[in-house]
């Protein structure tokens, strides 16, 4: 759509960006699905960090909306969708805020590890609003072993794969985008 006064396009995303967002979202969804048989081991956190570093906050935020909406279509509506619509953008904003301050993969691995470690707590807060404080507390305490696994797997995954994936996607984005 053209702006009548300036003659410039007023679209939010170009066609190339929409295709990119679709491909990145599909990669997230399929990556999560492939690893779903292993409790709390996932590549979604890694990919959101890499997408933010390579493609920027704006595109990564749109990917998070598409990914979460796709997850709802797969798994149905529940209280978890509130957390997904909040936490993935928060991870993107944190990554974006620290992208110039953190140069090595260790800093990003710590962010990913802490994110995984606190993931269940955020769900417990939302569950408390719907089912009561005691339910939320039990939900969180029973999930602590899974949160520890989630944090450790996020740390290791980002530590090992962030740099090569960032390098690869940066090179591909220069060639195709």
Language model regions located:
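Short helix-perturbing small/polar motifs within transmembrane alpha-helices
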Residues: 2-8, 17-24, 63, 83-128
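Hydrophobic transmembrane alpha-helices
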Residues: 2-50, 58-62
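Interfacial aromatic-anchored transmembrane helix boundaries in multi-pass membrane proteins
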Residues: 29-41, 66-99, 131
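Hydrophobic transmembrane alpha-helices of multi-pass small-molecule transporters
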Residues: 46-49, 72, 92, 120, ...
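Interfacial segments of multi-pass membrane proteins
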Residues: 51-57, 70-75
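Structural signal for the C-terminal ends of transmembrane alpha-helices
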Residues: 53-56, 94-102, 163-170
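Membrane-embedded alpha-helical hairpins and interfacial helices in multi-pass inner-membrane proteins
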Residues: 81, 104-177
């Amino acid at each position: 759509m053209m702006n009548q006064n300036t003659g410039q396009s007023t679209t939010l995303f170009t066609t190339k960006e929409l295709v990119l967002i679709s491909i990145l979202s599909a990669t997230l969804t399929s990556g999560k699905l492939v690893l779903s048989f292993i409790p709390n081991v996932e590549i979604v956190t890694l990919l959101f960090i890499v997408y933010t570093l390579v493609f920027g906050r704006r595109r990564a935020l749109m990917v998070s909306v598409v990914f979460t909406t796709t997850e709802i279509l797969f798994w149905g509506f529940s209280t978890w969708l509130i957390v997904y619509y909040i936490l993935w953008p928060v991870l993107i904003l944190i990554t974006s805020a620290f992208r110039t301050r953190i140069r090595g993969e260790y800093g990003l691995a710590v962010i990913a590890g802490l994110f995984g470690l606190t993931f269940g707590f955020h769900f417990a807060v939302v569950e408390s609003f719907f089912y009561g404080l005691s339910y939320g507390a039990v939900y969180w305490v029973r999930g602590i072993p899974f949160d520890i696994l989630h944090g450790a797997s996020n740390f290791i995954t980002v530590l090992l794969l962030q740099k090569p994936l960032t390098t690869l996607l940066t090179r591909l984005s220069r060639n195709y985008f």
